[in-house]
Amino acid sequence: MQWIRPNSIGGSNSRSNLRTARLRGHSTLMNEIKIQVKTLPHFEGLPLPQHQTEGASGIDLLAACQEPITLQPGDRALVPTGIIIALPPGLEAQIRPRSGLAIKHGITLLNTPGTIDSDYRGEVQIILINHAREPFTVTRGMRIAQMVLAEVVKTKLEVVDNLEGTRRGAGGFGHTGH
C-alpha cells in the first residue's frame, strides 16, 4: 500500500496532526487540527459541535436559542450557536446547510456558504430561511448547519489590457444548455 503525505496546514506538522482513516475501503490521510472555542453563557448544557461520522467533512453546529424560534414560510432568523472560534491565519470556516433539513423541511441558509474569517472573534450565528409551505420550529440543541474548514488563498488583483482567450469565452448563465 502506498501513502501520499500531503503538506499539513501551514506547512508544519506542529500545527496539524495527521491521522489515518479507512474510508470505504480506501486508505486516506485526513488533516486534524485543534481549534480554540469559547462558549457563551447561552451555550451551557449543550455538547460541543463534532463530526457525526469518521468521514464527515463538517461538524454540526447546534442551535443555542433559549426559546424555540418558529420560522413561518418565507421567514428568516438569526440563530445563535453560543460559540466563538479562533481560527489560525490561512483558514476560514464555511457555514453550510444541512441536507436533511433542506430536503425534509425546506430549511436552508440564506447566505451559503457563510464565511467565518480567521480574524473574526464574534459569536458564530446562522441565518436560516424557511422555503417550505409550513412553519418550522428551531429548538435548543437542534443541529442547524455544518461548519467546514478550508484553506484561504489571498488574492491580489492585477489590471491588464487583455486576457488570454478561452473556448468558453464570455458565455455564462446557462449557455452550455440546461
Question: Where in this protein do the model-derived segments appear?
Answer:
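DUTPase catalytic domain/fold
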Residues: Q2-I4, N17, H26-H178
